Regions:
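Helix-start (N-cap) detector for alpha-helical repeat units in TPR-like alpha-solenoids
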Residues: 39, 73-74, 107-108
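Bacterial Sec signal peptide processing site at the extreme N-terminus
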Residues: 16-40
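Canonical tetratricopeptide repeat
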Residues: 78, 112-113
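Canonical positions in the second alpha-helix
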Residues: 64-65, 98-99
Length: 126
C-alpha cells in the first residue's frame, strides 16, 4: 500500500521540483557602473541642458544618470533644485530625500527639504 502510494507520489514530486526550477528568477546580470569620466560628461551634458533652459530634458538626463549611478547623490540634488525652482515643492522634497539617502550631510538637499516643506505649509494655509 505504502509502496504504491510512493510510486504514485514520486513522479509527482519530481514534476513539482522541475516546475519550481522553471519558475525561479534568472540570475541578475552584473550592473555596469560607468567610469568617472563618463559620469562627469553625462552630468556636464545634463547641466548644459539645464543652463539652456531645457529643464524637462535636463531632468530626464539627470534621472537616467541616477539610474546608471545609483550611489551618486549629485543627479538627485540637481533634480530637486529644478523642481524647487519651478515651484514643485513636493517633487523637490522627494528628490532631496533621495539625495539624503546617498549623502546624509548634503546641505542643499536639507535646505530644499526644509524650505520646500515650509512653502507647502504656507500654501495649505492660503
Amino acid at each position: 500500500m505504502i509502496s504504491s502510494r510512493l510510486k504514485t507520489l514520486t513522479p509527482l514530486a519530481f514534476a513539482l521540483m522541475v516546475l519550481a526550477g522553471c519558475a525561479s528568477k534568472p540570475v541578475a546580470e552584473e550592473v555596469q557602473v560607468p567610469s568617472a569620466e563618463v559620469y562627469a560628461k553625462s552630468l556636464a551634458d545634463a547641466d548644459a541642458l539645464s543652463a539652456a533652459g531645457n529643464q524637462e530634458a535636463a531632468v530626464s538626463a539627470y534621472r537616467k544618470i541616477a539610474i546608471d549611478n545609483p550611489t551618486k547623490p549629485d543627479p538627485w540634488v540637481k533634480v530637486a533644485q529644478i523642481d524647487f525652482a519651478q515651484g514643485h515643492y513636493s517633487q523637490a522634497i522627494v528628490s532631496a530625500e533621495e539625495t539624503l539617502k546617498r549623502d546624509p550631510s548634503n546641505r542643499q538637499a536639507k535646505s530644499i527639504t526644509a524650505v520646500g516643506g515650509l512653502r507647502l505649509a504656507v500654501r495649505s494655509l492660503e
